[in-house]
Amino acid sequence: MRDSFHRQITYLRLSLTDKCNLKCGYCWTSFQHDCPAGSAENGRLGEFTSFGYAERLMSVRAAAKVGISKVRLTGGEPLCYSGLVDFIADVKRVPGIEGVFLTTNGTMLADKAADLKGAGLDGINISLDTLNRDKYKRLTGFDMFDKAMGGIQAALSSGFGKVKVNVVLIGGFNDDEIGDFVNLTRDEPLDVRFIELMPMTGSPLFGKEAYLSGRVVLERCPDLKSVGMDDPSSVARLYALGGAKGRVGLIEPVFSSFCDKCNRLRITYDGYVKPCLHSSDEYSLVGKSEVEMERTIRNAIDAKPREHGDLRCLRTDIDGVTTGGRSMRRIGG
């Protein structure tokens, strides 16, 4: 289905839970942990909402009927969701769904990567913002750096064709590690993707002084050469070092907006369709039949704005961007 600006909407980001076993400063708007001691078991408490397993699967079927073909499962931390493996297998069976992907912090991935692959998961994005153990603990609140690195290796060993490492660029925190991240691509078939920080209103740690343009990566690593994009709807411009097994991606929502080719919708963990990340507009799927969900999703697609309202402000004043009153963990990363 096309929206009112003729963009083909094919990509659904579906949040399974708002719980997470880490506590990264740019994702949270308060300092209260809801998964003490990094526990995945505690995170599972978040599943018991009025929008559960059956409703989420129904929403995928409804979305597929309007043209969604790619689903990315997010959180919170989706590996906190105890039904994840079965859910992936069920989504893969939905007619029209061609790919199912996962975004995770990787800390619980080592023991689950093989099962996820067996369920039909097509690719994994792993969020990792530093290669320094002390900084990792400072950012996330937990000393789980080794588990995150083990998750990356488990994903590679399990045969996933697409393993991506997402790095949020944070001025004064990890910009001294850009070269180290780029070097990860030399010997491993990883896509390391640098993402511009979009400071969210209410984020306790990072303001406009932390923003860095993705172009700083090219300035620090002049040996990177452009290799284009994976497809026209991709948000990452890709580069590579000569002879490297992997690639480097730049995702620049501030410096180089991609609203004009946005092909995605989000469904929050509690059952609301968000046509735009930075819009307060939400469309409830709670308590609806599959037919009603399909109608609601169509309405949300029709309501997608040309670009998010904060975009112009971002380019001139990086004080903070609204997400419709929700922190990122309550929307879906």
Report residues per predicted region:
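Auxiliary Fe-S-binding modules of radical SAM enzymes
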Residues: M1-T10, D187, L197-G333
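Canonical Radical SAM [4Fe-4S] cluster-binding loop centered on the CxxxCxxC motif
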Residues: S4-G52
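Residue-level signature of catalytic and energy-coupling elements of molecular machines
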Residues: L16, V192, G271
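A short, compositionally biased micro-patch
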Residues: T17-K19, A119, T268
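Glycine-centered loop/turn positions within well-structured domains
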Residues: L22, R133-D134, S257, Y283
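Short, flexible helix/strand-to-coil boundary loops that buttress conserved ligand/catalytic motifs
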Residues: W28, A113, T140, L277, ...
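A short acidic, helix-capping loop that chelates divalent metal ions and anchors anionic groups
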Residues: C35-A37, N132-L139, T201-L205, S284
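Radical SAM/AdoMet-radical enzyme domain recognition
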Residues: S50-L73, E77-I195
